């Protein structure tokens, strides 16, 4: 597994690198924190571990840059005790988040879970769903409508798949949150709202503004 570890604390970087390599992960770091994307593009990681507090530009900046060109899984690290860091990471499409200090074995378990969820699923036979006049490719986390294509994060796609399989039915927030936890995604009531809002914004880009309806106090409904 190719891991890009974007961490400016050299002591922590070396400790994590040594531990990850014992699990046969191939780990690369950053030499110039103004050129993170150069290393990202040349190393082509399968997962990125991204610290929030970095010199020159913060981790949120680099997450945006990565999301412009890739859906690679991103796990954020942060030493700040600030819930908004977690919310921001979700808004930017991160796959997981850990607050420092943390147990290395928990980090490794999260990396393995992300890898299984992303790469073992995408290696399966292509799966598609038809919804309204759009085609949803579950293996690529994409939606195509006419000549327009949008890409979703793994969490957004799970939410959408749950709603579509129960079209014209109200799906409770608790049902969605439970499904996401079962899939080893990290989510709370607040981050579910963030993900649904981000999903709606992406759907609006292809003219599907009212495809998902909020049922106040009950949950969400995907219309036929």
From Swiss-Prot:
Q: Which is a Gene Ontology cellular component entry for this protein? A: cytosol
Q: Which residues carry this modification: 4-aspartylphosphate?
A: 51
Please give the subunit comment from the record: Interacts with GraX.
**Record SUPFAM superfamilies:** C-terminal effector domain of the bipartite response regulators, CheY-like
Q: How is the polypeptide modified once translated? A: Phosphorylated by GraS. Phosphorylated by Stk1; phosphorylation increases the DNA-binding activity of GraR.
Cellular location of this protein? Answer: Cytoplasm
GO molecular function, a single term? transcription cis-regulatory region binding
Q: Which stretches make up the Response regulatory domain? A: 2-115
What does this chain do?
Member of the two-component regulatory system GraR/GraS involved in resistance against cationic antimicrobial peptides (CAMPs). Upon phosphorylation by GraS, functions as a transcription regulator by direct binding to promoter regions of target genes such as adhesins, exoproteins, transporters, toxins, and proteins involved in cell wall synthesis. Down-regulates the expression of many genes involved in RNA and amino acid synthesis or glycolysis.
DNA-binding annotation, residue ranges on this chain = 126-224
Q: Which gene carries the instructions for this protein? A: graR
Pfam families, sorted: Response_reg (PF00072), Trans_reg_C (PF00486)
**Mind telling me what this protein is named?**
Response regulator protein GraR
Top-level taxon: Bacteria
Phosphothreonine PTM sites in chain numbering: 128, 130, 149
InterPro entries reported for this sequence = CheY-like_superfamily (IPR011006), OmpR/PhoB-type_DNA-bd (IPR001867), Sig_transdc_resp-reg_C-effctor (IPR016032), Sig_transdc_resp-reg_receiver (IPR001789), WalR-like (IPR039420), WH-like_DNA-bd_sf (IPR036388)
Q: Keywords for this entry?
A: Activator, Antibiotic resistance, Cytoplasm, DNA-binding, Phosphoprotein, Repressor, Transcription, Transcription regulation, Two-component regulatory system, Virulence
Q: Name one GO biological process term.
A: regulation of DNA-templated transcription
Q: Which Gene3D superfamilies match?
A: 3.40.50.2300, Winged helix-like DNA-binding domain superfamily/Winged helix DNA-binding domain
